[in-house]
C-alpha cells in the first residue's frame, strides 16, 4: 500500500502567557517559531512478519528481557515499575539532563504548539541528574500507563489535576513550596526551567507518596521485539527523518552504530550530564486526533483510544503501521503491521512521537 507524505510549507509562531499553561497554576511565557518547506515523499510499505525458524533467545538465570528495550537486564528491574518524568522542552530548558539514559522518550504537542517530553527510565536509581522537570498534562498519564510507569511532574494543568485527583492516581507530585527533599532547583537557570531530581530523590519521592512499585501480575509488556536487529522489510529509505513539530525533531541514521542521532531546534540534542547526543534504535510515529479544549489557553486533548495510522522507522528504513487501544484504563497501545500482525521492533531505545494527524513526516535517502 502506497502512502504519500507531503510536507506543506508554512510558518507557525506561537506564544503562550499563562499559569501552568492549561490550568493557570504556574507562570510561564513560551514562544516558538518553525518554518518548513514543501517536500513530497512516497513510501512502499510491506508487511514485516516473524521469520520462520528464528533463533530462540537464551536468557541467563537471574536476567530478563526488558519490557522497554527488549535488551537483557537484571530480572529485578522487570519486577518493578519504571519511572516516567515530564521534561521541559523549550529552548530555555536546553540542554536537558539525564534524558539520554531514558529507555523510551515520548514527545507530544501541548498548548501554543510547543512540545513536552516524557522520559521513561527502568534503571532510575542510577540517575545523577534529570530534568528540567515540568508540569503534567492529562494525556501524558496515558503514555505513562502504556509503560506501567510511575509518573513524575512539577506542577500540573487543571485537566491533569482533576484527573489525578478524581481517579486517585498516585503520582510523584512535586509542587512549589512543597517537598524540597524530593527535588532541587539549579542556580544556573531561571524558574520554571530549573527543577531537577536525582535517582536518590526519585526513590525517596516514591516512598513519600506511597506509590506501588510492583508490576502487574503476569505482565508481559506491550512492545514486541526482534531477537536480533532486523531491517524493516520493504521499507522506504529513511536516512533522515524530520517531523513538523515546533521543536523540529530531526534524525540522521548512523549506519556504523545502527542508531538515529537526534537533533532539535536546528542543533544536536545533547544530554548535559554526559555531553552525548541522543540516539535511538527505533522511531515510532503515532498520528492521533488533537482537539483544543480551552481556547483561552489553547489546552489540548488527544484521542488515544480506537485506532489510527503511524510509522515505524529503524535501520534506515520506514514502514507504515497502525495502532489501536480499546480503553484508557485497562488496555495499552498496540502497534500493528499493515496486515494486522503485532509489530516487532528492534532491541534498544525508542523515540515515540504522538502527533496531530495533519503534521508531516519527511524521509530522505
Regions found by a protein language model. Give the residues of each.
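A surface/extracellular/periplasmic glyco- and lipid-processing/surface-interacting theme
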Residues: 32, 36-40, 53-104, 111-365
Amino acid at each position: 500500500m502506497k502512502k504519500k507524505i507531503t510536507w506543506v510549507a508554512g510558518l507557525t509562531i506561537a506564544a503562550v502567557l499563562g499559569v501552568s499553561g492549561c490550568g493557570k497554576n504556574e507562570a510561564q511565557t513560551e514562544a516558538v517559531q518553525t518554518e518548513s518547506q514543501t517536500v513530497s515523499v512516497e513510501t512502499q510499505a510491506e508487511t514485516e512478519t516473524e521469520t520462520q525458524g528464528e533463533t530462540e533467545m537464551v536468557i541467563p538465570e537471574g536476567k530478563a528481557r526488558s519490557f522497554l528495550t527488549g535488551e537483557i537486564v537484571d530480572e529485578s528491574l522487570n519486577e518493578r515499575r519504571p519511572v516516567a518524568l515530564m521534561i521541559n522542552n523549550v529552548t530555555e530548558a536546553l540542554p536537558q539532563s539525564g534524558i539520554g539514559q531514558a529507555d523510551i522518550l515520548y514527545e507530544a504537542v501541548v498548548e501554543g504548539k510547543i512540545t513536552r517530553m516524557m522520559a521513561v527510565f527502568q534503571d532510575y536509581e542510577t540517575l545523577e541528574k534529570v530534568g528540567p522537570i515540568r508540569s503534567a498534562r492529562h494525556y501524558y498519564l496515558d503514555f505513562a500507563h502504556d509503560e506501567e510507569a510511575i509518573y513524575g511532574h512539577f506542577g500540573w494543568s487543571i485537566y491533569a489535576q482533576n484527573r489525578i485527583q478524581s481517579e486517585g492516581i498516585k503520582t510523584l507530585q512535586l509542587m512549589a513550596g512543597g517537598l524540597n527533599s524530593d527535588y532541587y532547583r539549579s542556580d544556573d537557570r531561571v524558574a520554571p526551567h530549573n527543577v531537577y531530581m536525582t535517582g536518590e530523590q526519585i526513590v525517596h519521592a516514591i516512598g513519600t507518596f506511597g506509590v506501588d512499585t510492583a508490576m502487574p501480575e503476569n505482565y508481559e509488556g506491550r512492545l514486541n521485539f526482534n531477537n536480533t536487529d532486523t531491517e524493516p522489510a520493504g521499507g522506504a529509505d529513511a536516512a533522515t527523518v524530520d517531523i513538523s513539530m515546533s521543536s523540529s525533531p530531526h534524525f540522521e541514521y548512523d549506519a556504523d552504530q545502527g542508531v538515529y542521532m537526534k537533533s532539535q531546534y536546528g542543533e544536536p540534542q545533547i544530554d548535559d550530564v554526559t555531553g552525548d547526543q541522543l540516539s535511538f534504535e527505533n522511531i515510532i510515529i503515532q498520528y492521533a486526533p488533537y482537539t483544543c479544549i480551552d481556547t483561552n489557553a489553547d489546552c489540548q486533548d488527544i484521542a488515544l483510544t480506537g485506532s489510527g495510522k503511524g510509522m515505524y522507522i529503524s535501520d534506515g528504513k520506514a514502514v507504515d503501521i497502525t495502532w489501536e487501544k480499546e480503553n484508557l484504563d485497562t488496555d495499552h497501545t498496540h502497534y500493528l503491521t499493515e496486515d494486522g500482525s503485532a509489530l516487532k521492533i528492534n532491541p534498544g531505545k525508542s523515540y515515540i512521537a504522538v502527533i496531530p494527524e495533519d503534521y508531516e513526516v519527511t524521509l530522505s535517502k
